[in-house]
Amino acid sequence: MPFALGQRWISDTESELGLGTVVQVEGRMVTVLFPATGENRMFSRAEAPLTRVTYNPGDTVESHEGWSLTIEDLTEKDGLVIYHGIHSETGEQVTLRETLLNHNIRFNKPQDRLFAGQIDRLDRFGVRYQCQMLRHKLATSDLLGLQGPRVGLIPHQMWIAHEVGRRYAPRVLLADEVGLGKTIEAGLIIHQQLLTGRAERVLVIVPDTLRHQWLVEMLRRFNLRFSVFDEDRCVEAYADHDNPFYTEQLVICSLELLRKKKRLDQALDADWDLLVVDEAHHLEWTEEAPSRAYQVVEALSEVVPGVLLLTATPDQLGHESHFARLRLLDPDRFYDYDAFLAEENSYKDVAIAAEALAGNAKLPDAAINSLTELLSEKDIAPSIRLIQADGIDSDVQQAARSELLQELLDRHGTGRVLYRNSRASVKGFPKRFFNPHPQTMPEQYLTAARVSSMMGGHKTLEAKAAQALSPEKLYQEFEDNSASWWKFDPRVDWLIAFLKSHRSKKVLIIASQAETALSLEEALRTREGIQATVFHEGMSIIERDKAGAYFAQEEGGAQALICSEIGSEGRNFQFASHLVLFDLPLNPDLLEQRIGRLDRIGQKNDIQIHLPYLEDTAQERLMQWYHQGLNAFELTCPSGHVLYAEFAEDLLNVLVGDDADELTNLLNHTQSRYKELKHAMEQGRDKLLEINSHGGDRAKAIVERLAQNDENTQLIGSVIRLWDIIGVDQEDKGENSIILRPSEHMMFPTYPGLPEDGVTVTFDRDTALSRDDIALITQEHPLVQTGLDLITGSETGTTSVAVLKNKALPAGTLFLELIYMADASAPKSSQLYRYLPPTPIRILLDKNGNDLSAKVDYASFDKQLSAVNRHIGGKLVTASQPILHPLFAKGEEYAQAAVDELVIQAREKMTTQLTGELDRLESLKAVNPNIREEELEYLRNQMQELNTYLDASQLQLDAIRMVLVSHV
């Protein structure tokens, strides 16, 4: 290369150094000073990775003194270029030697880099374009936020997340029956809200025992890094902020922490966007005396825009506590308990009409009359005629049914705030089989009971019943050695024999008391050496996690896990199918929660429920009430809570006494009332609620689209190429997985989210679901998103020169491919991306300035191109400059016209969608007070903001590829 002192060059490998000046040429070496950083670099003259910087007529350059020059001509003297042109400030004719150019110039615009000879590899241009296309596709997907989580594609879960996650500040009660996946639904909604920018700060309140489980679940399933806050963490955070809750965006804490006034005040002041409360059925409320826990959540719900309440046990027919939870979501709507009860009485007519619409038969007259009355403000006659007509296309009829059903759901009841799926409406559950195992009452227990009754003392009926149900506890009160009961209790003998005969099976054992669980573990270990682990409230969260993992381990793990009652809240063990109830809880909801640890979606086997009980005792009588009265062992019993409240006193008397006639009467009355409630629930609100909650065919359609996206091999190829270009080390591991590791030759110094020791990933959902240690890669995964950001946020692939070998075209024919980005700067929360996301615009110009992009698609054109090296590419660009300058101007004209059209389309789409939604909600507000004014105001403001942002839309040249035809 010919070098001369004072010439300006730029480093091909360190463009951030700015414009360099040749300060020494000696022998075979050249030294370049980069004044912007004050650094020197010495290069071999023959192989220096440097590009000579020269400008052309029409360019504007800046002097080191700060004034600019518009170049009209240039001359060369002693190897240095002298620019002649117009001074930007004085308008005079001036000259500027290249030595005096501003050294802070960086060539980050694609055309500047192209003319400076900073030309990228051909494959990098392709990857950059693919990255921009992937980002655009993701931003425009109405399934954004549903594809990425590592969860099964279960229709009702995806439907609820799709419906709720798209709302501004959703306020809903997720009340699916046990085992239907409320935590996953909440995680999907959180993931959607964060990914779409509708929320940035999230507070999750959970029972103390579930904090770590939520932390792991959010990270493992949703790639969301929450922080667990307790008192110690709050104290530590003071070093960073006066309010500890401001130190993290995503926080999990317990209600216990927020019972403290200081912590609650800080949480109230922390500007959360979304509040999530798990196990919300523990929030007790009466109008006269709401609990402290309820007051804490109520205070937060008044200042946080979005609220999700998760509860496994909402009352079915208008219980006060259920009303109280709805009141948290919308106190204006649910202001009076009596008014709420009165409204529920009208659900029957709505349910009948909804059930008729959900079927396939013609509508009976009663249903038509109900619909006409319920939707009186709307002309439904055309839809009714379509449904009732013969010979009409079934899809058209189904669309008419769906439209009326949606109108019904929108206008009546709690359809927008309450989602409740039952097992009756969701397929895929195993059967439950009840196996009672009667045992003889030990003499020791009979003696302890006699002594206790002789000693007298005043006890409540409930305390007496609890004592009768746990004779081992009563016995321990009279024994110094609390563990001795298990040496004679026949239930323990049965349990040991059962475990020995089922050695290959995992068995979950649940007892009411932690002391009982510990004693059982000791009995199994000391008497037979059976591997079992314990799970109780006295253990730390980490100890509980270890116990759960030890039980889950296939090789060398525990055969049995023995839980106290807390083991039946929040922990799931679908890999086991045998459940031993060592005793029975006095609450039907607790019994269902126990069984629900195994009876969940994902359970592959039928569930065997075993109950060793002592004959002719309170245990047997309670078992009979559950089994014969409620059928609670083999079926879920949604009315259990109501039935227990009605029959509690009679049941307690039966448990404490020994009157066979009383028991028979209780069972008969319970069975009769159970049937009444079951019939009432089928006739009432539940049908309508379930139709709305499981989504029907619409939910199936969402799942089908997600499954198709999972099979997208084009995406897999694009992501693999992305990692190849960045330089990520990829090692195949088995049929469906890859190990990713950082490499020494990566294009970027770090790859956020990629651990130093690597990570195992898969594109196959089933593989990821079966292996906790393998990440599921989709477009939404942080490793993909980060990779896209690394490429599109850098200069990678912004310039390229290629050769087209085609003898049908004259040699030397030039094409200029320009990739523009149409964009508008706006906060993510504005939702502008739904209408005008960053959109790639491809322009392919021939030498005459004609745009050929509509005739020549990217993929077929790209396949015909061959790469050229950087230096040859630089020479080709220099030789083609006179042609290129007018082509850039022409390309911008075409791109601007495309942007203008995109903005028109975006504005029309936005106006149509938001005006339609606003009109719908305003008309609904007249008949359904469940529509919040905040939602309407948000839509009005959003339309104004979006119009402003669209007015400021911009066009930016993102990448250039110059192509020359060659016959060689």
UniProtKB/Swiss-Prot annotation:
Keywords: Activator, ATP-binding, DNA-binding, Helicase, Hydrolase, Nucleotide-binding, Transcription, Transcription regulation. Its EC number is 3.6.4.-. InterPro entries: Helicase_ATP-bd, Helicase_C-like, Helicase_RapA, P-loop_NTPase, RapA_C, SNF2-like_sf, SNF2/RAD54-like_C, SNF2_N. The keyword Hydrolase applies. It is an enzyme of class 3 (hydrolase). One of its GO terms (biological process) is regulation of DNA-templated transcription. ATP binds at D176, E177, V178, G179, L180, G181, K182, T183. Interacts with the RNAP. Has a higher affinity for the core RNAP than for the holoenzyme. Its ATPase activity is stimulated by binding to RNAP. Transcription regulator that activates transcription by stimulating RNA polymerase (RNAP) recycling in case of stress conditions such as supercoiled DNA or high salt concentrations. Probably acts by releasing the RNAP, when it is trapped or immobilized on tightly supercoiled DNA. Does not activate transcription on linear DNA. Probably not involved in DNA repair. NCBIfam families: PRK04914.1. Belongs to the SNF2/RAD54 helicase family. RapA subfamily. HAMAP family: Helicase_RapA. This is RNA polymerase-associated protein RapA. It comes from Shewanella sp. (strain W3-18-1). The gene is rapA.
